[in-house]
From Swiss-Prot:
The gene is queC. Its cofactor is Zn(2+). GO terms for biological process: queuosine biosynthetic process. InterPro entries: QueC, Rossmann-like_a/b/a_fold. Keywords: ATP-binding, Ligase, Metal-binding, Nucleotide-binding, Queuosine biosynthesis, Zinc. This is 7-cyano-7-deazaguanine synthase. It comes from Salmonella paratyphi C (strain RKS4594).
Length: 231
């Protein structure tokens, strides 16, 4: 039996990954992390979506220690979430240091226990947000270290790594989940479901991608299929 673990936030990217995993694996587990994030509503959204999309199990892990160590606008109400700035340089204040290091490592430990062959994460380098822990180089390096540390061959899969946000919408549509992803996921840094606040970087990237996909469906779908190998 083929098993996978999805690092699952209930946002657009991880929900699209879950939708795909349900078609590619016999058994899919979801792991969601409570780190005291500003947008904690995502945990309830993740619970609902994991059930709706047929995950075998859904674990919510308490990692609130990360909140104490990592200062970010996503972990501190006193730090405002910035509006989208198209030409902003450097690492944004929404970056949570160590988040993906911790999430992927814990997901791999869980995968070890349930005998899953893959950990799936929705990180993406194409629409690079300034987060160093979303890079392909980082994921591969951590995957190598985790496998050495557990003497186990667990594969970190990044199905969105080389597709842009419009193509991610196309992927959701390919698996028949465009409306669900559009209406029921929570991507917004300010914790607003669906289309979100419309001002933060996450909402801007999501909306621009959706508009581009809806305006150029055939071309974007074809590009997504070419990059992912889907038919």
């Amino acid at each position: 039996m083929k098993r996978a673990v999805v690092v699952f936030s209930g946002g657009q990217d991880s929900t699209t990954c879950l939708a795909q995993a349900r078609h590619q694996y016999d058994e899919v587990h979801c792991v969601t992390f409570d780190y005291g994030q500003r947008h904690r509503a995502e945990i309830d959204v993740a619970r609902e979506l994991a059930l709706k999309l047929g995950a075998r199990a859904h674990k919510v892990l308490d990692v609130t220690l990360l909140n104490e160590l990592a200062v970010s606008s996503l972990t501190r109400d006193s730090i405002p979430v910035p509006d989208y700035e198209p030409n902003a340089d450097g690492i944004p204040n929404t970056f949570v240091p160590g988040r993906n290091i911790l999430f992927l490592t814990l997901a791999a430990i869980y995968a070890y226990q349930v005998k899953a062959e893959a950990v799936i994460t929705g990180v993406c380098e194409t629409d690079f947000s300034g987060y160093p822990d979303c890079r392909d180089e980082f994921v591969k390096a951590l995957n190598h270290a985790v496998n050495l540390g557990m003497a186990k061959d667990i594969r970190f899969e990044t199905p969105l790594m080389w597709i842009d946000k419009a193509e991610t919408w196309a992927l959701a549509d390919y698996w028949g989940q465009l409306d669900l992803v559009r209406e029921e996921t929570l991507t917004c840094y300010n914790g607003i479901k669906g289309d979100g606040c419309g001002h933060c970087a996450a909402c801007n990237l999501r909306a621009n991608g959706l508009n581009h996909y809806l305006s150029n469906k055939a071309a974007v779908m074809a590009a997504m299929k070419q990059k992912t190998g889907l038919r």
